[in-house]
Amino acid sequence: MEKLLLPILDKTFVENLIPQKAPFVMVDKLLAFCENEITAGLTVPEENIFVSENIFQESGLVEHMAQSVALYTGYQYFLKNEMPPTGYIGSIKSIKIERLPKIDENIETSVSVLQEFMGVTLVDIISKVNEEIIATSQMKTVIAS
């Protein structure tokens, strides 16, 4: 596999970096990546399973945040020519949702890795639409063994 230039807007490529599969994929672009940080994106499609009355629901936004962390891990594994691992949300320490995105809005989510140890990743997450912060969270994700 060759290293790709960022941003990566190929939805199929991005989907292959995470364990989730359609219709449960909540990230569709990898915008930036560096040590301990990633910015992922999602343009909310009308047919998304978490859309109700043209609004992307809380559960979808939380899953988007978690999949942004999974994308960080998956891209790390891609760079090492390894298959991405399966993981899950271990805990959510805090989450604050200011507003929910609408269909066709572009969510940009920045993940800052605070700590990684034995498959557990502690992160701060900020989700924005048009530079407006719509949600923040601190969560732990765990790689399944």
Residue ranges and their predicted role:
Residues 24-26, 107-108, 121:
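Hydrophobic core residues within well-ordered beta-strands of beta-rich domains
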Residues 41, 47, 100-110, 135:
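Terminal leader/tail segments of proteins
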Residues 7-8, 71-108:
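Hydrophobic beta-strand-centered segment that forms part of the acyl-chain substrate-binding groove
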Residues 22-57:
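Catalytic strand-loop segment that frames the active site of acyl-thioester-processing enzymes
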Residues 28-31, 98, 112-114:
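Conserved positions in beta-strands of structured domains
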Residues 43-77:
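A conserved, well-ordered hydrophobic junction motif at loop->secondary-structure transitions
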Residues 1-36:
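N-terminal leader/capping segments at the start of a protein or of a new domain
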Residues 2-4, 71, 102-103, 112-145:
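HotDog/MaoC-like acyl-thioester-processing domains
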